[in-house]
């Protein structure tokens, strides 16, 4: 946000990887000459050439007189260097502005810079007794319309969306962001034995929406057919007879995918948790009871033996959505990372 004479004259944000950073977008959107203005940024301006030129360069050229910064950039290529360059050019800086609030906004970026897998969040809808489907597998719909609309906003915020083959076979989803001006996330399907149908919505739209299928299958004929339809095949090592989910995430990180929203079933969720790959959870909770020991839960598998082994969450936030509630929280160990 750029301010001059106590008026906001420009705003901007980093819209996508490879696109203009927030500072350059804000300068581009200025309604008048920003010379002598002040700028407020959540993250220290970059000072190196990457996919875009340094933002420090743009601020100097624009004649900005002061920069207010929420967080210093943990990227070793920046890490205080942006502040130094601005100061060396006579631009005043002040850091630590709303530092904690800015850290929360920058969670995904900070994690991406400091870790070898993307920031990974589980999303599921469940009843008050913790069921994501009935004993017969029926799950449409657990939550109401407002909660389901909110999911599409959430998808828009993540670079990729992951699901297991069980979800694809049961629901034939599109896994896109159906909101105005929404960005469709890259779709990642964990399909160990390539059971996905060539007639599924995922495969039929693979040329419109980037689609990755992670597998351990060596079925070259099926692989060739899926590739012809536009799917990218990601081969991984085997873990317990399935794709190695941590390896999948590492490969996604190498593709510069910074965040993954997981909309899988209990088996995929359990695998991710077991491999320490979960950083946040979004639980949409409906005021309903299903019951039944065979009804599916958000996390399958053997479960833990001792309470001390439980995954614990902090920074909890509850949001009413019609008759439902969205409860979100961050895994405690992930808070220590940032």
Set out the residue ranges of the language-model regions.
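Short beta-strand scaffold segments in enzyme catalytic cores
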Residues: 1-6, 124-125, 327
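Zn2+-dependent cytidine deaminase-like catalytic core
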Residues: 2-101, 186, 212, 273
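Residue-level signal for inorganic ion chemistry
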Residues: 46, 86, 130, 164, ...
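Residues at the N-termini of beta-strands
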Residues: 66-67, 160, 259, 280
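Short gly/pro/ser/thr-enriched loop/turn and capping motifs at secondary-structure boundaries
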Residues: 74-77, 100, 169, 195-197, ...
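Active-site ligand-binding patch in enzyme domains
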Residues: 111-112, 121-128, 132-258, 267-270
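Conserved histidine-centered catalytic loops in small-molecule metabolism enzymes
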Residues: 218, 301-338
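Flexible, gly/pro- and Lys/Arg-enriched active-site loops
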Residues: 273-313
């Amino acid at each position: 946000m750029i301010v001059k004479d106590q008026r906001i004259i420009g705003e901007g944000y980093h819209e996508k990887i490879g696109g203009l950073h927030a500072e350059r977008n804000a300068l581009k959107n200025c309604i008048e000459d920003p010379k002598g203005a002040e700028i407020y940024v959540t993250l220290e301006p970059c000072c190196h050439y990457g996919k875009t030129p340094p933002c420090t360069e743009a601020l100097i050229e624009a004649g900005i007189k002061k920069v207010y910064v929420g967080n210093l950039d943990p990227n070793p290529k920046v890490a205080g260097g942006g502040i130094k360059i601005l100061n060396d050019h006579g631009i005043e800086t002040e850091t630590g502005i709303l530092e904690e609030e800015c850290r929360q906004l920058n969670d995904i970026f900070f994690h991406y810079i400091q870790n070898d897998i993307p920031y990974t969040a589980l999303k599921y809808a469940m009843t008050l007794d913790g069921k994501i489907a009935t004993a017969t597998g029926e799950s449409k719909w657990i939550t109401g319309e407002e909660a389901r609309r909110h999911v599409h906003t959430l998808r828009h915020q993540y670079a990729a969306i992951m699901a297991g083959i069980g979800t694809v076979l049961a629901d034939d989803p599109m896994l896109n962001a159906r909101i105005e001006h929404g960005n469709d996330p890259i779709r990642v399907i964990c399909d160990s034995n390539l059971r996905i149908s060539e007639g599924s919505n995922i495969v039929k739209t693979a040329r419109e929406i980037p689609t990755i299928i992670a597998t351990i299958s060596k079925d070259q004929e099926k692989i060739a057919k899926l590739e012809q339809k536009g799917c990218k095949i990601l081969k991984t090592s085997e873990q317990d007879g399935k794709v190695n989910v941590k390896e999948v995430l590492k490969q996604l990180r190498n593709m510069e995918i910074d965040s993954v929203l997981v909309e899988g079933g209990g088996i995929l969720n359990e695998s991710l948790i077991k491999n320490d790959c979960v950083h946040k959870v979004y639980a949409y909770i409906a005021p309903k009871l299903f019951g039944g020991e065979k009804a599916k839960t958000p996390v399958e598998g053997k479960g833990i033996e001792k309470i001390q082994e439980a995954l614990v969450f902090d920074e909890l936030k509850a949001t009413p959505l019609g008759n439902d509630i969205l409860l979100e929280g961050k895994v405690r160990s992930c808070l220590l990372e940032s």
